[in-house]
């Protein structure tokens, strides 16, 4: 028995369709706010003899536009919105969040060795996301250990780290199998992007996302799930095996980055050595990878970071 029906919803983003999930009068991650996405979701609801006004709750796994954009329309139609406590302020003021990220990462990327003009271009690009993700009020801000009832099933909330600020999973048991809605934290055939994240509050310490993501994946593996319902593409039917593959990929790239910092090297130099001449549209992802693996080396005591005249360099510690 399948508790959730997967509905691929079109997005304008490179990743392709996002998976919305329907169960009774609940929608999980409805998709971006576009007419094409809305028509797809409406058609899926109609196949189940529902209209948008019949949806009672929207669960949001993480505050990325391709996942939560349509939550605003569904809430206007009468649904309540459920998201994590950490994601709530982002969802409720998404333009403000984008402005905060732009300011933080412009300065940070310059410190990493990026030209000021390039940093401006790279950090301006995400502003387009606001067109697909209107802010939405969160009616129920949940934390790890909280439960949500969906079509007679009890879903338990737990924290995830690595892909987005405030991401959570919803776990449940059906047919004797432990299953979880995991958003984009684990995907079947592509490696999730461990995106850089700013401090929760201005002036705070930048979170070291990739080391935390590796730890989160290891914890998720030990939880013993039998199936993951993912944010894109097909479900993961062998979670432990897939997590092992992702962790192996991370370890291999970390070793390559270690080889690149035998001498003091900026994060931008590392990004260019890994990926070549990336277009501006892909440099945020590239910097997330480069800085993430440098953070892993730093956390393990395998690299030394220095800042001289406002520029960061990393050097391997042998």
Which positions does each model-derived feature cover?
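Active-site HxH/HxHxD metal-binding segment of metal-dependent hydrolases
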Residues: 32-39, 43-147
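Gly/Ser/Thr-rich active-site loops/lids in small-molecule metabolic enzymes
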Residues: 247-259
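Hydrophobic "anchor" residues on beta-strands that sit immediately upstream
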Residues: 25-27, 58, 80, 178-180, ...
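Conserved beta-strand hairpin/beta-sheet module of binuclear metal-dependent hydrolase folds
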Residues: 1-48, 169-189
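C-terminal regulatory/interaction regions
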Residues: 256-318
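Divalent metal-coordination and catalytic microenvironments
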Residues: 23, 29, 62, 74, ...
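Well-ordered beta-strand scaffold positions
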Residues: 2, 25-26, 86, 146, ...
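Metallo-beta-lactamase
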Residues: 33-34, 152-244, 248-249
